[in-house]
Amino acid sequence: MEALGKYFIFLGKLFVNRETFGTYFKLIIDECVAIGINSIFLVSLVSFFMGAVTTIQTAYNLVSPLIPDYVISLVVRDMTILELAPTIIGVIYAGKVGSSMASGLGTMRISEQIDALEVMGINSTSYLVLPKILGSLLMYPLLVILAGLLSIVGGYLAGEFTGVITPTEYIYGIRFEFNEYMVTFALIKSFVFAFLVASISSFKGYYTTGGAVEVGKASTAAVTQSVIAILTADYLLAQLLLQ
């Protein structure tokens, strides 16, 4: 409970004694590049093969002649939008971006760079962490959209090359009884996950004490706690918004 209270106090400090908009704008752009642009390749690779594997495994399990082939792509669509794109990519995001945030801030803490900012009268929490959270909120939903699209494309190509489903049937299943709310739900999850990963990772890195070993431990703890938070939020959001 003490750590939880410290976390909420940490979040409250983000909005105290803030810098000018121009200062934040440059920092946010830098974070968007580090968080989003540098993650595109990994997200694209994982998403493409995630869709391909999901298509093949779904086709393997749906062997009944009573089940039409388009159900394969329907299952891929729903699994991708509702769960795989936001949640699986969220776990990868925590491992790549979250650990980077924690180790970066942890290194600044043990090298006394954060203390130097405080001495100069700068709110180090707001200056260092707020751009990371805003950059994460801007870029992670875009990564989720990219992941969803590439998963569906990966499933399409896997179905065509393996012959488990024809392109016509695949596209029909993707469009069959499509519910736009699934996209809304996925985007809501993406914003929540983006905030959790950025804030928890920054929190663990910001309060690092000791030396290089502790920075590594903080980075590991940031990833672990971010993944736990993602899975917990995933369940709660599904319970609240899909009833």
What are these regions (language model features)?
Residues 57-81, 148-191, 199-218, 240-243:
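Membrane-interfacial helix-loop-helix connectors in multipass membrane proteins
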Residues 37-49, 85-90, 138-147, 184, ...:
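Hydrophobic alpha-helical transmembrane segments of multipass membrane transporters and ion channels
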Residues 1-26, 204, 209:
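Short, membrane-interfacial amphipathic segments enriched in basic
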Residues 36-88, 92:
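Active-site cofactor/substrate anionic-group-binding motifs, chiefly glycine-
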Residues 20-45:
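Membrane-interface helix starts
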Residues 72-115, 200:
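Hydrophobic alpha-helical transmembrane segments of multi-pass membrane transport proteins
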Residues 123-144, 218:
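Start (N-cap) of specific transmembrane helices in multi-pass transporter permeases
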Residues 105-130, 212-215:
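Short cytoplasmic-facing helical segments at TM-TM junctions of multi-pass membrane proteins
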